[in-house]
From Swiss-Prot:
InterPro entries with a match to the protein in the record: SDH (IPR005631), SDH_sf (IPR036714), SDHAF2 (IPR028882)
Protein name: Succinate dehydrogenase assembly factor 2-B, mitochondrial
Keyword S-adenosyl-L-methionine listed: no
Presequence range in chain numbering: 1-23
Role: Plays an essential role in the assembly of succinate dehydrogenase (SDH), an enzyme complex (also referred to as respiratory complex II) that is a component of both the tricarboxylic acid (TCA) cycle and the mitochondrial electron transport chain, and which couples the oxidation of succinate to fumarate with the reduction of ubiquinone (coenzyme Q) to ubiquinol. Required for flavinylation (covalent attachment of FAD) of the flavoprotein subunit of the SDH catalytic dimer.
Disulfide bonds: none
Family: Belongs to the SDHAF2 family.
């Protein structure tokens, strides 16, 4: 019995040792690194300073594969506002797009480097640049106005439950 008690105490001491050590070391935090003291503010308005990678064009991609990719990309934007707007837009319109409309939608959601730009253009907060002011953008703006007053608090299901 004493051997088991001693073993239990040894194990508990081993488990709680880092916790005890952290309580006993009440030292001040280390000084900041020298490289962080003289940080430089980067001006991102200069396009030559920070080149953004261009989205690869996929000319030989089959239309059905492109639509599947765009449906996924419409749902997984990384910001909830665009996830909701673009996923509901894609669920409503993407299946009926022809090849040219699909290419315009691809350029819209993948050609822009900042998702907030898409959001501001679609909600008419900022004017849409000429190269993105297409039939698809006008359709997206109408979709965002939500004249039908459809609830869009969640993304639509990928597949309807009827099938």
């Amino acid at each position: 019995m004493f051997r088991q008690l001693r073993l239990t105490m040894d194990i508990s001491g081993w488990i709680f040792m880092p916790w005890r050590r952290s309580l006993s070391n009440k030292q001040s935090p280390p000084p900041p690194l020298a490289s962080t003291i003289n940080d430089v503010i980067v001006d991102y308005d200069d396009p030559d300073y920070l080149p953004l990678p261009e989205y690869p064009v996929r000319p030989n991609e089959p239309l059905d594969i492109r639509k599947q990719r765009l449906l996924y990309q419409s749902r997984k934007r990384g910001m909830l506002e665009n996830d909701l707007l673009l996923s509901t837009f894609a669920a409503k319109y993407l299946d009926n797009f022809n090849a040219e409309q699909t290419a315009q939608y691809d350029q819209l959601i993948n050609g822009v480097s900042n998702d907030w730009d898409i959001y501001y253009w679609a909600t008419d907060v900022k004017p849409t640049p000429k190269e993105y002011d297409t039939e698809i953008m006008r359709l997206l703006k109408d979709h965002v106005k939500n004249a039908e007053r459809i609830s869009r608090i969640r993304q639509p299901d990928l597949y309807s439950s009827e099938s």
